[in-house]
Amino acid sequence: MNILLTNDDGIEAEGINTLAELLSKYHNVTMVAPENQRSASSHSITIYEPIIVKQVKKPYNVEAYSISGTPADCVRVALDKLVPDNIDMVISGINKGLNIGNDILYSGTVSAAIEGAMYKVPSMAVSAQFIKNKKENYKIAAKYALGMLNRLKKEDLKNDVVLNLNIPFCSEEEIKGIKVCKVGNKIFNTRFLEEIDKEGNKILKLEGDINEDIYEGTDVYYIRNKYVTLTPLHYDLTNFNILEETEQLFLS
């Protein structure tokens, strides 16, 4: 396959480079990623500033470019200027940290994959659980991403769907399997620590904790129970459950 590889952690991040090195052994890979860390960029794009593109050398067989913009910018620029017309799949990751539950609304990783789907290119976001003070093992996540590609044939890929793949932090032997599941509820309870600088300005620093609803059948539940999760996503945010009900409110 011809693969466009991007992320939100930046072009030098361990996750994307681990994945690029493995995928490039079996597929034609072009890496286009932010020059710096752009986590939680969501689906923002650059409008009022020029985007700077730099070619980057990598020690394995990929063509690589850094972009001064956001993760979504990377996909837009790549598909318009940097990659061949016959890209088979956009892959975003491997992200440092899960993108499950409400995380997906903030995620630059997921949004880059969604941007690919908006261009009618099948896309997948790949994220690995991060545990503070423990060393990440991106090789396990890369192996699952490659395995997912090997199970998918080109004719199986829907061009407007994003596959959201998340891998728990544990040994490969501890992983219980793969669960296709829906998005769960994982909310960051935001609090800001307030300080005052020398000029008397308020300085707000983000802190808080995570509130998870552990309902069986969701990505949050299965990650907690050491399953790899796969969730199909779509960029159409219409709430079809109340579409007709809402219409009736304005007809009455």
From Swiss-Prot:
Gene3D superfamilies (alphabetical): Survival protein SurE-like phosphatase/nucleotidase
Location of the protein in the cell: Cytoplasm
UniProt cofactor(s): a divalent metal cation
Catalysed conversion reaction: a ribonucleoside 5'-phosphate + H2O = a ribonucleoside + phosphate
Cofactor binding note from Swiss-Prot or TrEMBL: Binds 1 divalent metal cation per subunit.
Family to which the UniProt record says this protein belongs: Belongs to the SurE nucleotidase family.
Name by which UniProt lists this protein: 5'-nucleotidase SurE
Organism listed in the record: Clostridium botulinum (strain Loch Maree / Type A3)
